[in-house]
C-alpha cells in the first residue's frame, strides 16, 4: 500500500520537508484522518497468540478499542479529529486489490500451518497478513464516532484524496495517514504516526509537500510521475527500477512519457515495461480523483457533545468493554471537547492565499531547479563516459 521507498527518498533528498515532534505540538488543530488505514492498524495489533481482541461472544473488538482510545488521546492533546472513510475503489485499483486478496489467502494457509508447527513469531506474522477491514468494521466505527461526537465522512473513492481536498481548502490543518500516496493527491501537509499507540513512542512526522518538491527540484507532475515509477496501488512497478533509478530517470528525462520512450529504445533492453501499464490513467487519478468538493454541505463538520449513556450501552453492554472505564473516559472526552474549543494563536490570523503571480513564480523556481538537476545528471553521465573511454595508464 502506498508508494514504495518514497519516504526514504524524501529523507535523503529533501530532509527539510520532514519535521518530527510530539503529539502536543498539534494542539488546537483540525486534522482529517484516513479512517480505513487507521482501522487496519488497530486490527493488526494482535496478541502473541495471533488472536485479535475479542469479547465473550467471540466478536472482534480491536477496531473499536483502537478507535475509541486513540481518538481520546488526540482530543486529550487538543486535536480536533475528523475521519474520512474509503468509498468504492477506482477501477484501476482492482488489480492491486486482487493481489492483496491472494496474499491474504496464502497467509491464511500459512497461519494454519504455523499454528501447528511454527513459532509464536510465525503465528503473529501470518495473522497480520490475514487482516482485512470489512464493511462491518467501518459501520461499527462510524457508530462509535457518532456517539463520541466526532465527525466523519465517506469519500466517493479514496479517503486520502478526500483528506487532501479538505487540507488544501483549509478545512483542516493536515491529512493524517500512513499512506505516502496522500502526497500525490497534493495535501499541503501529511501527518504520520498520529494514530499510533503511545507505547510505541514514535514521534509524529509532519511532511510538507512544498518542501518535498523544492528539495527534489520537481514540479507536481514530475513528483507524481516519480511516485508511479516507484510503484503505487494502481500499477505494477517496472522490474529492475528501484528508488535510485526512478529518481535518476525522472530527473534526466523529465516526464514518464520520455522515460517510457527511452526504455523502449534502449539498445541493451534492460527494462521490460508491463504489457498493461496505463500510467496516464494512474496520473489522472492523482490529479483528478473522485472527491466531494470542500464546499459540499457534507464537508461542513461539527464536533458535538458525546453521548455518554450511548457509549456505555454500545461499548460496555453490547461489546463487553469495562463500564467503569468507558464511563470515566467518556466524561473526560466531554470535558476535553469543551476545552478544545480554544484555538491556536495562528487560528486568529487569516492566511492569505498566494496570488497567481506568486504561484507562477514558485512554479518557475521549481522548473529551474529541475532543469539544473537534469543538467547536473547529464554532465555526470558525460564525465563517467569520458573516464570509461580513457585508456588505462594514460
From Swiss-Prot:
It is found in: Nucleus, Nucleolus; Nucleus, Nucleoplasm; Mitochondrion. Residues 384-394 have a biased composition (Basic residues). Binds 2 magnesium ions per subunit. They probably participate in the reaction catalyzed by the enzyme. May bind an additional third magnesium ion after substrate binding. Residues 356-394 are annotated as: Disordered. Phosphorylated. Phosphorylation upon DNA damage induces relocalization to the nuclear plasma. Residues 341-349 are annotated as: Interaction with PCNA. Its EC number is 3.1.-.-. Residues 356-383 have a biased composition (Basic and acidic residues). It holds the Pfam family XPG_N. Its cofactor is Mg(2+). Mg(2+) 1 binds at residues 34, 86, 158, 160. It is an enzyme of class 3 (hydrolase). Gene3D superfamilies: 5' to 3' exonuclease, C-terminal subdomain, 5'-nuclease. Structure-specific nuclease with 5'-flap endonuclease and 5'-3' exonuclease activities involved in DNA replication and repair. During DNA replication, cleaves the 5'-overhanging flap structure that is generated by displacement synthesis when DNA polymerase encounters the 5'-end of a downstream Okazaki fragment. It enters the flap from the 5'-end and then tracks to cleave the flap base, leaving a nick for ligation. Also involved in the long patch base excision repair (LP-BER) pathway, by cleaving within the apurinic/apyrimidinic (AP) site-terminated flap. Interacts with PCNA. Three molecules of FEN1 bind to one PCNA trimer with each molecule binding to one PCNA monomer. PCNA stimulates the nuclease activity without altering cleavage specificity. HAMAP family: Fen. Belongs to the XPG/RAD2 endonuclease family. FEN1 subfamily. This is Flap endonuclease 1. It comes from Sordaria macrospora (strain ATCC MYA-333 / DSM 997 / K(L3346) / K-hell). The gene is FEN1.
